[in-house]
């Protein structure tokens, strides 16, 4: 089977939406029966985003096989059925690390190690490896054409197109076509200069996706085609939309998938986008709305919680309600009190690291528990719920996590010191171990208790969810907490670790150690988020009586 590659680049400015455009195109090609995957190549020097600040980089998306990756991989999984893996995302730092390790081992037989050919060859090998077994691979190059960091990647894809044959490689370039209000027209010059920049590297784009706040007129698209040496039907207008799930239909209506299939000589049926039309219909026709407060520490950049925000929206789709998300800084709860949590239909505490704002989260969990407000805790959100219950219900004064207070009297959450890696080998880690790549990561099996609320929602006794954490519930102190009324609703496959807790005498209080947001999609939703939004609607109705 021959694999075809679509290389996606961006020009003029960053944040044009290359990831969304690539994912939308992949969704159309998948709807034509093709086996599609997407890769993201990040030009930064970090080995992976695992230790990067969420405020700088956005969330870290965790794949099934435990890779800490760029948030764009979350978009990919929400748009196509193919599951991403560690092969779908790599960085400049990862490439250089691999090449330097080979150099130290002597693999290059004393040769002078250079960007060309050693770095570019390593990039090409990764791309080929990631594309194995697929009909079409979309490869998104992070950054903007012209950035010095992107040059090795651009050179590598230029070479790769020659290596595999131009009949199996296609370059798609996203560019900005700004509207000038004073002139009353869109301007094509930035696009022309961006393509000129690509040409100077040796890449002639085959398709241009023109991003604008409005539809780019046909005469302007013809002008772009003429000056950029691109077929007129390959100049696609992609205007701003109120829902990203409309983009597959917009691209299909302009014949982008037909153009690509013809270019690659792929004989496949017409795309059926009925599932996406259903998503758009559900989004456009809600029967009500709810307000959910998300209490976190990285709220100045909503992308830090991208998958959680999307999963809440998916929960809204499944309940035919619009979810209004109110982002609340947990430090504000500490300084201003729980008054700022008034008028919420439900409360969610997402994952996080570090002590800043933790007491605000503990106070939030208590407020939700004592006032019967639906509560969903994720990762740290489960740990603070446990700490709060231990302190205020189980009589364990000053209970805490050893992450925050190492020598506390009741360490109800503690560091896991023994781990099994993907090969089954036992590793011992301590608080002095490296932060990068040393967490419990990826898909893990969980057994649900028969009487639990989550068992009803999932409809199955065992589930698989993705993890990203270093601290766990301390089993040594669990008996006292359970005796006070907390329900252990889910345990790890080996029965050793607590994965889900519930408060039984509460309408809906669920907290999980894993990250359910990573497996939620607009077409299928997720049982926990669908149940959570439903509980918010029911709470709203009770309050209105």
UniProtKB/Swiss-Prot annotation:
Residues 1-266 are annotated as: Amidoligase domain. GO terms for biological process: 'de novo' CTP biosynthetic process; pyrimidine nucleobase biosynthetic process. Keywords: ATP-binding, Glutamine amidotransferase, Ligase, Magnesium, Metal-binding, Nucleotide-binding, Pyrimidine biosynthesis. L-glutamine binds at residues 352, 380-383, 403, 470. PROSITE patterns: GATASE_TYPE_1 (PS51273). Disulfide bonds: none annotated. The keyword Nucleotide-binding applies. It is an enzyme of class 6 (ligase). CDD domains: CTPS_N, GATase1_CTP_Synthase. HAMAP family: PyrG (MF_01227). This is CTP synthase. It comes from Citrobacter koseri (strain ATCC BAA-895 / CDC 4225-83 / SGSC4696). The gene is pyrG.
């Amino acid at each position: 089977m021959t694999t075809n590659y679509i290389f996606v680049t961006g020009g003029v400015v960053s944040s044009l939406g290359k990831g969304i455009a690539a994912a939308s195109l992949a969704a159309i090609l998948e709807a034509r029966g093709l086996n599609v995957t997407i890769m993201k190549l990040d030009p930064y020097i970090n080995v992976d985003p695992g230790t990067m600040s969420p405020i700088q980089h956005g969330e870290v998306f965790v794949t099934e096989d435990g890779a800490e990756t760029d948030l764009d991989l979350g978009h990919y999984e929400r748009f196509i059925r193919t599951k991403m893996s560690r092969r779908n995302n790599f960085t400049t730092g990862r490439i250089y690390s691999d090449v330097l390790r080979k150099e130290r081992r002597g693999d290059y037989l004393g040769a002078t190690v250079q960007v060309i050919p050693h770095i570019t060859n390593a990039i090409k090998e990764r791309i080929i490896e990631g594309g194995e077994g697929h009909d079409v691979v979309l490869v998104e190059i992070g950054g903007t054409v012209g950035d010095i960091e992107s040059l090795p990647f651009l050179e590598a894809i230029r070479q790769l197109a020659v290596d595999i044959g131009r009949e199996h490689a296609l370059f798609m370039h996203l560019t900005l076509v700004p509207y000038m209000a004073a002139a009353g027209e869109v301007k094509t010059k930035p696009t022309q200069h961006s393509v000129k920049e690509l040409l100077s590297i040796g890449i002639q784009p085959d398709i241009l996706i023109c991003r604008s706040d409005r539809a780019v007129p046909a005469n302007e698209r013809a002008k772009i085609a003429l000056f950029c040496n691109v077929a007129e039907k390959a100049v696609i207008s992609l205007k701003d939309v109120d829902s990203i799930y409309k983009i597959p239909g917009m691209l299909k209506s302009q014949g982008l998938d037909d153009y690509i299939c013809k270019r690659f000589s792929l004989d496949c049926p017409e795309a059926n986008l009925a599932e996406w039309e259903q998503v758009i219909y559900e989004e456009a026709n809600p029967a009500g709305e709810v307000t959910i407060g998300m209490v976190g520490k990285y709220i100045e950049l909503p992308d830090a919680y991208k998958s959680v925000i999307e999963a809440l929206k998916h929960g809204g789709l499944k309940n035919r309600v619009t979810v209004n998300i109110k982002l609340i800084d947990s430090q504000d709860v500490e300084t201003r009190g729980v008054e700022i949590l008034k008028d919420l239909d439900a409360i969610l505490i997402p994952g996080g690291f570090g002590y800043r704002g933790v007491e605000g989260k503990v106070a939030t969990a208590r407020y939700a528990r004592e006032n019967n407000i639906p509560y969903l805790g994720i990762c740290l959100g489960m740990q603070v719920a446990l700490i709060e219950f231990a302190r205020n219900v189980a009589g364990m004064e000053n209970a805490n996590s050893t992450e925050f207070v190492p020598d506390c009297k009741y360490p109800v959450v503690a560091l896991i010191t023994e781990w099994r890696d993907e090969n089954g080998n036992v590793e011992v880690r301590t608080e002095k171990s490296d932060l990068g790549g040393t967490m419990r990561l990826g898909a893990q099996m969980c057994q649900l208790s028969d009487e639990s609320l989550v068992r009803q929602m999932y409809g199955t006794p065992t589930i698989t969810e993705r993890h990203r954490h270093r601290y766990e519930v301390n089993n040594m102190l669990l008996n006292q907490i359970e005796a006070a009324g907390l329900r252990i609703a889910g345990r790890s496959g080996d029965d050793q670790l607590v994965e889900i807790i519930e408060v039984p005498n509460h309408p809906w209080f669920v907290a999980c150690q894993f990250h359910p947001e990573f497996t939620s999609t607009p077409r299928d939703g997720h049982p926990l988020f669908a149940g959570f939004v439903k509980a918010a609607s029911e709470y709203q109705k009770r309050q209105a009586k």
